[in-house]
Amino acid sequence: MVKVYYNGDIKENVLAGKKVAVIGYGSQGHAHALNLKESGVDVIVGVRKGKSFAKAEEDGHQVFTVREAAEQADIVMVLLPDEQQQKVYEAEIKDGLQAGNSLVFAHGFNVHFHQIVPPADVDVFLVAPKGPGHLVRRTFEQGAGVPALFAIYQDVTGEAKDKALAYAKAIGGARAGVLETTFKEETETDLFGEQAVLCGGLTSLVKAGFETLTEAGYQPELAYFECLHELKLIVDLMYEEGLAGMRYSISDTAQWGDFVSGPRVVDEKVKESMKEVLKDIQNGTFAKEWIVENQVNRPRFNAINASENEHQIEVVGRKLREMMPFVKQGKKKEAVVAGAKN
């Protein structure tokens, strides 16, 4: 069973006298920095000049360039997009690290796949809230928190675990529970969830359902509602009560259809495909492809993205969402809270 830590399990004053640099001020960065500050941690922000720099200053932080922040800090938390981290680390972070410092991540991709090779004389650990930045911030303000993962990659000082748990506590994670894992497990499960279920699997399922209905002659607007729009209703039930709770809340007709038709759609062949996806993650194939794609300025990524944005479900969806201003209101509120992307 996974080991879970709560506030009472974590040593006090571990971060006292230590300066934490949050690198990046996007969705996670703004939440970490504000929560750390309000927990009494000495925190600074490192970010490139621009909107994020101005927003961090507006929020009351001491803001520096990435290089300046890394040079001052005892603990450096890297909260940049995966594809930016390696270049920024090499150019602006690495030389500022001193023996006994801590290099911290919220996702293990670059360390696990050896894009970032930390110095041998620093602690390296991971603290990953299991929720977007606006939720990390909002729950903290409410006196609660979002569960988080932590993992130790390199413990030079003998204090890496204490520092990781103290950091997780300071951003509110230990109010809900901090789960112990490894860089390998966090990275591979996170990528698999994104690719096979949450993003890749789900979008492909939605499009296939939409296309099945429209190709059979049904109106695309109805297909959109049935295969995409109403998804939120079901996901919210699953999020709050699990699969059984969702099934309790839907009609018996829908539940019977779930039981008899769901396995026909997601069958053993699909599961075998999922295993292939997992294998590509585990052996580094996916990581290599993504790294190379970024090195050549993303030709496939950009082409696929442009094509997907003009799929019929998007064209229909844009029109239908104009009929539902409440959808956009929720999006605008979240964007204001989250701040800039990086």
Curated annotation (Swiss-Prot):
One Pfam family cited in the UniProt record for this chain: KARI_N
Residues noted as binding NADP(+) in the record, renumbered to the chain: 25-28, 48, 52, 82-85, 133
KARI N-terminal Rossmann domain boundaries: 2-181
Catalytic-site annotation from UniProt: 107
Annotated binding of Mg(2+) 2, by residue: 190, 226, 230
Reactions that this protein is recorded to catalyse: (2R)-2,3-dihydroxy-3-methylbutanoate + NADP(+) = (2S)-2-acetolactate + NADPH + H(+); (2R,3R)-2,3-dihydroxy-3-methylpentanoate + NADP(+) = (S)-2-ethyl-2-hydroxy-3-oxobutanoate + NADPH + H(+)
Protein's pathway: Amino-acid biosynthesis; L-isoleucine biosynthesis; L-isoleucine from 2-oxobutanoate: step 2/4; Amino-acid biosynthesis; L-valine biosynthesis; L-valine from pyruvate: step 2/4
Binding site for Mg(2+) 1: 190, 194
Cofactor dependency: Mg(2+)
GO molecular function: ketol-acid reductoisomerase activity; magnesium ion binding; NADP binding
Role, per record: Involved in the biosynthesis of branched-chain amino acids (BCAA). Catalyzes an alkyl-migration followed by a ketol-acid reduction of (S)-2-acetolactate (S2AL) to yield (R)-2,3-dihydroxy-isovalerate. In the isomerase reaction, S2AL is rearranged via a Mg-dependent methyl migration to produce 3-hydroxy-3-methyl-2-ketobutyrate (HMKB). In the reductase reaction, this 2-ketoacid undergoes a metal-dependent reduction by NADPH to yield (R)-2,3-dihydroxy-isovalerate.
Entry protein name: Ketol-acid reductoisomerase (NADP(+))
Originating species: Bacillus licheniformis (strain ATCC 14580 / DSM 13 / JCM 2505 / CCUG 7422 / NBRC 12200 / NCIMB 9375 / NCTC 10341 / NRRL NRS-1264 / Gibson 46)
